């Protein structure tokens, strides 16, 4: 095992949320809110093909529509979409991803990892609460703030 690309996971300059949502109580909305209010000073990009904005923040229709590759992506999409999202992120140049999505069976997990491998894209998850880096103001998690 190597530490290659871990700096993008633990010290990102930009973050994209794939699966941002306006739906109250959804993981995509909680993570979007946490990212915006955590104090992170880097670039935050939201991705959802059904919205132009979410809470006033511009929203991109897809990973490939992003103006630049984020250092870190947070994935909160349905299980069957995760391998394709990871493949798009890898092709776009993203080097780390946190997959909050739960419910990936063994085949989907394997396809996700195979999509990440050619680009050495580091993956945390699936089925995790997210990633919190207090020293950077990053709350890329589905944990409700108290």
Give the ranges of each region predicted by the language model.
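Catalytic-core regions of core metabolic enzymes
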Residues: 1-146
């Amino acid at each position: 095992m190597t530490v290659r690309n871990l700096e993008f996971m633990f010290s990102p300059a930009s973050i994209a949320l794939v699966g941002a949502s306006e739906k109250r109580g959804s993981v995509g909305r909680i993570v979007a809110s946490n990212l915006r209010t955590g104090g992170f000073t880097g670039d935050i990009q939201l991705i959802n093909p059904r919205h132009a904005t979410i809470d006033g923040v511009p929203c991109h229709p897809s990973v490939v529509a992003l103006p630049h590759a984020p250092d870190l992506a947070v994935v909160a999409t349905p299980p069957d979409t995760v391998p394709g999202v990871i493949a798009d992120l890898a092709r776009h140049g993203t080097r780390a991803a946190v997959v909050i999505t739960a419910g990936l069976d063994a085949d989907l997990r394997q396809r996700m990892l195979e999509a990440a491998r050619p680009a050495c894209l580091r993956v945390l998850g699936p089925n995790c609460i997210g990633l919190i880096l207090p020293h950077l103001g990053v709350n890329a998690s589905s944990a409700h703030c108290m």
